[in-house]
Protein backbone atom coordinates (compact mmCIF):
# COMPACT_ATOMS: atom_id res chain seq x y z
CA UNK A 1 0.00 0.00 0.00
CA UNK A 2 1.39 3.37 -1.05
CA UNK A 3 1.47 6.28 1.39
CA UNK A 4 1.93 8.92 -1.32
CA UNK A 5 -1.48 10.35 -0.43
CA UNK A 6 0.05 11.43 2.93
CA UNK A 7 3.02 13.18 1.30
CA UNK A 8 2.41 16.92 1.77
CA UNK A 9 5.08 17.75 -0.83
CA UNK A 10 2.85 16.32 -3.58
CA UNK A 11 0.02 18.30 -5.16
CA UNK A 12 -3.53 17.71 -3.90
CA UNK A 13 -4.32 16.16 -7.29
CA UNK A 14 -1.44 13.65 -7.02
CA UNK A 15 -2.37 12.75 -3.46
CA UNK A 16 -6.03 12.31 -4.38
CA UNK A 17 -5.19 10.17 -7.40
CA UNK A 18 -3.01 7.89 -5.26
CA UNK A 19 -5.64 7.54 -2.53
CA UNK A 20 -8.54 6.87 -4.89
CA UNK A 21 -6.52 4.27 -6.81
CA UNK A 22 -6.08 2.31 -3.57
CA UNK A 23 -9.61 2.61 -2.22
CA UNK A 24 -12.17 -0.12 -2.84
CA UNK A 25 -15.62 0.75 -4.14
CA UNK A 26 -17.04 0.13 -0.64
CA UNK A 27 -14.53 2.60 0.85
CA UNK A 28 -15.37 5.24 -1.74
CA UNK A 29 -19.10 4.82 -1.18
CA UNK A 30 -18.59 5.06 2.59
CA UNK A 31 -17.18 8.55 2.08
CA UNK A 32 -20.58 9.59 0.70
CA UNK A 33 -22.51 8.34 3.71
CA UNK A 34 -23.68 10.04 6.89
CA UNK A 35 -23.93 8.22 10.21
CA UNK A 36 -26.29 9.18 13.02
CA UNK A 37 -24.25 7.94 15.95
CA UNK A 38 -27.28 7.42 18.22
CA UNK A 39 -28.75 4.96 15.71
CA UNK A 40 -27.01 1.82 14.57
CA UNK A 41 -23.66 0.27 15.34
CA UNK A 42 -20.74 2.68 14.92
CA UNK A 43 -18.16 -0.13 14.61
CA UNK A 44 -20.18 -1.91 11.92
CA UNK A 45 -21.36 1.23 10.12
CA UNK A 46 -17.82 2.60 9.79
CA UNK A 47 -15.99 -0.58 8.83
CA UNK A 48 -15.08 1.05 5.49
CA UNK A 49 -14.78 4.54 6.97
CA UNK A 50 -17.50 7.18 6.82
CA UNK A 51 -17.77 10.57 5.20
CA UNK A 52 -19.92 12.44 7.65
CA UNK A 53 -21.24 12.21 11.20
CA UNK A 54 -24.46 13.99 12.11
CA UNK A 55 -24.22 15.83 15.41
CA UNK A 56 -27.98 16.21 15.82
CA UNK A 57 -27.88 13.90 18.83
CA UNK A 58 -25.16 15.99 20.50
CA UNK A 59 -27.99 18.14 21.86
CA UNK A 60 -28.46 15.39 24.48
CA UNK A 61 -25.00 16.07 25.91
CA UNK A 62 -25.12 17.96 29.20
CA UNK A 63 -22.23 20.27 28.31
CA UNK A 64 -19.96 21.36 25.46
CA UNK A 65 -17.18 19.34 27.11
CA UNK A 66 -19.29 16.18 27.03
CA UNK A 67 -20.25 16.77 23.39
CA UNK A 68 -16.60 17.37 22.50
CA UNK A 69 -15.59 14.14 24.25
CA UNK A 70 -18.23 12.20 22.33
CA UNK A 71 -16.95 13.70 19.10
CA UNK A 72 -13.34 12.71 19.90
CA UNK A 73 -14.39 9.12 20.66
CA UNK A 74 -16.37 8.85 17.44
CA UNK A 75 -13.54 10.34 15.36
CA UNK A 76 -11.04 7.90 16.87
CA UNK A 77 -13.30 4.97 15.99
CA UNK A 78 -13.86 6.23 12.45
CA UNK A 79 -10.15 6.80 11.79
CA UNK A 80 -9.16 3.45 13.30
CA UNK A 81 -11.74 1.66 11.13
CA UNK A 82 -10.55 3.34 7.93
CA UNK A 83 -7.58 1.63 6.27
CA UNK A 84 -6.38 5.09 5.32
CA UNK A 85 -7.12 6.92 8.58
CA UNK A 86 -9.60 9.25 6.89
CA UNK A 87 -11.36 11.45 9.45
CA UNK A 88 -15.09 12.12 9.27
CA UNK A 89 -16.62 15.53 8.76
CA UNK A 90 -18.97 16.39 11.62
CA UNK A 91 -22.15 18.06 10.39
CA UNK A 92 -24.07 20.36 12.70
CA UNK A 93 -27.19 22.37 11.96
CA UNK A 94 -26.74 26.00 12.84
CA UNK A 95 -29.80 27.81 11.54
CA UNK A 96 -30.91 29.01 14.98
CA UNK A 97 -27.64 28.34 16.81
CA UNK A 98 -25.37 25.42 17.58
CA UNK A 99 -27.41 22.39 18.66
CA UNK A 100 -25.52 21.75 21.87
CA UNK A 101 -26.19 22.49 25.51
CA UNK A 102 -25.41 26.05 26.66
CA UNK A 103 -25.15 27.42 23.11
CA UNK A 104 -26.94 30.63 22.19
CA UNK A 105 -30.36 30.17 20.58
CA UNK A 106 -31.48 32.68 17.95
CA UNK A 107 -34.88 33.36 16.33
CA UNK A 108 -35.82 31.50 13.15
CA UNK A 109 -34.57 32.82 9.84
CA UNK A 110 -37.88 34.34 8.78
CA UNK A 111 -37.92 36.52 11.89
CA UNK A 112 -34.34 37.60 11.38
CA UNK A 113 -35.00 38.28 7.71
CA UNK A 114 -37.89 40.54 8.64
CA UNK A 115 -35.44 42.78 10.49
CA UNK A 116 -33.76 43.70 7.18
CA UNK A 117 -30.48 43.94 9.09
CA UNK A 118 -27.62 42.17 7.26
CA UNK A 119 -25.12 43.28 9.92
CA UNK A 120 -27.18 41.50 12.61
CA UNK A 121 -27.26 38.32 10.50
CA UNK A 122 -23.49 38.49 10.08
CA UNK A 123 -23.02 38.84 13.84
CA UNK A 124 -25.31 35.87 14.49
CA UNK A 125 -23.37 33.73 12.00
CA UNK A 126 -20.09 34.69 13.70
CA UNK A 127 -21.44 33.63 17.10
CA UNK A 128 -22.85 30.34 15.80
CA UNK A 129 -19.63 29.48 13.94
CA UNK A 130 -17.50 30.30 17.00
CA UNK A 131 -19.65 28.08 19.23
CA UNK A 132 -19.61 25.22 16.72
CA UNK A 133 -15.84 25.50 16.26
CA UNK A 134 -15.40 25.31 20.04
CA UNK A 135 -16.84 21.81 19.82
CA UNK A 136 -13.98 20.74 17.60
Model-derived segments and spans:
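N-terminal beta-rich core of secreted/periplasmic extracellular enzymes
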Residues: 1-136
Amino acid sequence: MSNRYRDASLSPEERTEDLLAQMTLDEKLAQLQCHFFAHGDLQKDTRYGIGQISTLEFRQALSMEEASGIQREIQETVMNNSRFGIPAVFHMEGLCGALVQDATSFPAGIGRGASFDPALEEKISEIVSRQERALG
